Amino acid sequence: MLSKQIPLGIYEKALPAGECWLERLRLAKTLGFDFVEMSVDETDARLARLDWSREQRLALVSAVAETSVRVPSMCLSAHRRFPLGSEDDAVRAQGLEIMRKAIQFAQDVGIRVIQLAGYDVYYQQANDETRCRFRDGLKESVDMASRAQVTLAMEIMDYPLMNSISKALGYAHYLNNPWFQLYPDIGNLSAWDNDVQMELQAGIGHIVAVHVKDTKPGVFKNVPFGEGVVDFERCFETLKQSGYCGPYLIEMWSETAENPAAEVAKARDWVKARMASAGLVEAA
């Protein structure tokens, strides 16, 4: 029987770096998490995962089976380097090839959701043409995802093009495809001038997972929990009252910390206390 407990996961980059997924999932289990989100970022090392052999892919599947800690989602931020909106045809083609490989990888190892970075371009100047190319690239990507039965979910970003659920919903309506949904980050959403509760309510029915982190205006990473502007209890209450029952993912970048596990445990306890106050989980 499936548990009625709210699934709580941890981002791969919060845990010690390395390529042994069995060790990573064992640690996540020890820390009390239900799942780990994989990162495929713009570095060559993590991009290389998309070219894993059959044996390497099976090793991940085996690690999930052995630990019962799932890897249901992938944070695909590689499109910073190879954006779908690039005016360079070769760069854009590489971005689409990364998408194709990511979808195939997800299909092979059981990943259900690929979180997309909402950048038309990142290191270049955006314009009408980059936005048009981005839209067309999303359409092509969602067509591929549909055939593979893999969900593509747009993150709410640290970037004006996609800094609210309302903006992401515009793309959802444009694409009009059940395999394209939303994966909001309550930290990013709160760092902009958004009515956060209204935005969360507007996204219900399209939200497949939620990133949990703290932020400040203009500071989107490495803000310790409790030192930023996010009203966590209110966000959790709004999502609960709106009927959201999906997973929450603590997003951290503590893989290079002196003691990543201790940092993660501290953040886990802090977040779960706010979840308990909002009625999402039982108090410890």
From Swiss-Prot:
Keywords: Isomerase. GO terms for molecular function: intramolecular oxidoreductase activity, interconverting aldoses and ketoses; L-ribulose-5-phosphate 3-epimerase activity. One of its GO terms (biological process) is L-ascorbic acid catabolic process. Induction: Induced by L-ascorbate. Repressed by UlaR. Pathway: Cofactor degradation; L-ascorbate degradation; D-xylulose 5-phosphate from L-ascorbate: step 3/4. It catalyses: L-ribulose 5-phosphate = L-xylulose 5-phosphate. Its EC number is 5.1.3.22. The keyword Endoplasmic reticulum does not apply. It is an enzyme of class 5 (isomerase). Pfam families: AP_endonuc_2 (PF01261). It comes from the Bacteria. Catalyzes the isomerization of L-xylulose-5-phosphate to L-ribulose-5-phosphate. Is involved in the anaerobic L-ascorbate utilization. Belongs to the L-ribulose-5-phosphate 3-epimerase family. This is L-ribulose-5-phosphate 3-epimerase UlaE. It comes from Salmonella agona (strain SL483).
